[in-house]
Structure formats: structure tokens, C-alpha cells
Design a protein with these regions (language model features):
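Class I SAM-dependent methyltransferase SAM/SAH-binding core
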Residues: 72-119
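Conserved beta-strand signature within the Rossmann-like core of class I S-adenosyl-L-methionine
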Residues: 162-169
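N-terminal, positively charged/glycine-rich alpha-helical extensions of SAM-dependent methyltransferases
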Residues: 1-33
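Class I SAM-dependent methyltransferase Rossmann-like catalytic core
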Residues: 20-55
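Conserved class I S-adenosyl-L-methionine
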Residues: 62-71
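A short, conserved alpha-helix within the catalytic core of class I
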Residues: 142-154
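A conserved beta-strand element that flanks and buttresses the S-adenosyl-L-methionine
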Residues: 134
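C-terminal alpha-helical "lid/dimerization" subdomain adjacent to the S-adenosyl-L-methionine
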Residues: 171-223, 234-237
């Protein structure tokens, strides 16, 4: 497969296109979830460590854990191994095509659906049920095809008292622009694109699936209005996209 063909395959992604990627045997496990190999291969253990450092309820024995859009790279395998060791119950929500890439376990329920559009009744039936919720690297796709308000309301509803939700790896164009406006950012860009190249910075442009500071702050406001504490957290600097992505954490009081 040529590099041009691969770029085309990994562009303009949505729920249905991810189904196609999941069944494409010419792609690696990282490419099936929309990443070129160099962004994820050999790096997901560090990502998992960063997730665990924020979602402290993942260390609980017998916890109920929900992963929205787990994909099929190394991360869901790490989550499932952790769950098996701690006697946790896991629910994975994704397309059937993506879920088929993951092993079956007695402690894991696979739910084929588009969250939150197709899970409204399920969310009501599982109110206050989950001690840990993870939605990593997929929220910007969900936001294009669904209501951000419905997503936030559903997460807040599903969280158990004392539960923690991580909406992780959110691309923030404002954060990106700040980085590439700095000497460090220009050097980073030139290391990857050549010494005569300069990063494009447009403070007034936001593409579909991108968030800016206003969007991030509005998500915090929505969660807090739903009775849940909400925070913006940086990623570990060792992570591949830490200089232009960030995480949001929800915490429900006991």
C-alpha cells in the first residue's frame, strides 16, 4: 500500500469508516484506530500509565469499568488484563466490527452501539453504575456525529458516586497554536518538516472534530451543571501528542 493510499484511508474518519478500518487486514492495529504507527507503536504502555494515574478507580477491586470506543490497539488489552487481575467487570462499547478484534472474557460485556446516540435507554438503565469510564482518542469523532451535551449528560448519569471518567486525548487547536507560536514549537515542527518550514497558525480556524479553549471550557461547565466536578489535565510530556492534546476528568461526589 502506498503512503498516499494509507493517508486517504485514515482521513475523514467517522463511526462507519472505523468499521471498514477494523476489517482491513492490510492495516496494523494502530492504523485500524486511525493512527499512523509512529504515533502509537511502543508508546501505549506510557499512555496506559497516564490513564491509570488519573482514573484512580481503575485500581479498585470489583469495580465496574466502561470503555467507550476502545478500538483494537494495545490499550484495551491492558485494560482487560487489569480488570482480570482486580476482579473487575468491564463493558466495551464500539462497533461490532471493532469489538470482533478483541478477545472474549466472562467478565467483559461487548455492546455494539454508537455512543451516545444509540445508548440513551441503556444509560438510564445503568445510572450510577460505573466506577471508571474511559473515552480515549475518540471524543472528537463522537462530537461530529452526536450532541456534546448528550455525551456529557450520559457520562454524568453513568458514573457511580465516587466514580471517575476520563475523556482523553482531545485535540485542542488553541493549545496547538500556542505551542507552535513558541520557539519550542517551531523547532519541533522543523525537526519533522525541515529547517525552512514553519507551522501554520490560524487562531480563527477550527476544523470539524477540533476543539478550542471555548469548547473545552464549555464541557467543564456542562459537567458541573450536571453535578459532577470537571477538570482539564495535561498529558504526560512523554506521550506522542501531549503538546497539542489534553484530557478532561469528571469526578462524581460520593
Amino acid at each position: 500500500m502506498t503512503e498516499e493510499n494509507k493517508i486517504e484511508k485514515l482521513s475523514d474518519l467517522d463511526f462507519n469508516k472505523f468499521k471498514t478500518l477494523a476489517n482491513d487486514e492490510s492495516l496494523s492495529r494502530y492504523e485500524k484506530i486511525g493512527f499512523f504507527n509512529h504515533f502509537r507503536e511502543g508508546k501505549e504502555a506510557q499512555i496506559w500509565d497516564d490513564i491509570q494515574s488519573k482514573v484512580l478507580t481503575l485500581s479498585m477491586e470489583n469495580a465496574r469499568v466502561l470503555d467507550i470506543g476502545p478500538g483494537c490497539s494495545d490499550l484495551p488489552f491492558m485494560l482487560l488484563k487489569n480488570a482480570e487481575e482486580k476482579g473487575q467487570n468491564v463493558v466495551l462499547i464500539d462497533s461490532q466490527e471493532m469489538l470482533n478484534q478483541l478477545p472474549d472474557f466472562s467478565f467483559c460485556e461487548k455492546f455494539s452501539a454508537m455512543f451516545p446516540n444509540e445508548t440513551k435507554q441503556w444509560s438510564k438503565e445503568n445510572k450510577n453504575a460505573f466506577h471508571a469510564i474511559i473515552c480515549y482518542s475518540v471524543f472528537h469523532y463522537i462530537a461530529v456525529e452526536s450532541s456534546v451535551e448528550l455525551f456529557v449528560e450520559s457520562i454524568c448519569e453513568l458514573l457511580a458516586p465516587g466514580g471517575i471518567a476520563l475523556i482523553g486525548d482531545i485535540p485542542n487547536v488553541s493549545k496547538r497554536n500556542r505551542f507552535f507560536s513558541s520557539e519550542e514549537g517551531v523547532q519541533f515542527h522543523q525537526n519533522n518538516h525541515g529547517p525552512n518550514s514553519f507551522p501554520e497558525i490560524n487562531w480563527n480556524e477550527k476544523k470539524p472534530g477540533e476543539f478550542n479553549d471555548d469548547d473545552v471550557f464549555s464541557i467543564l461547565k456542562m459537567a458541573r451543571e450536571n453535578g459532577v466536578e470537571a477538570f482539564v489535565l495535561p498529558q504526560n510530556n512523554a506521550l506522542p501528542m501531549a503538546n497539542r492534546r489534553e484530557d478532561i476528568l469528571f469526578v462524581k461526589h460520593k
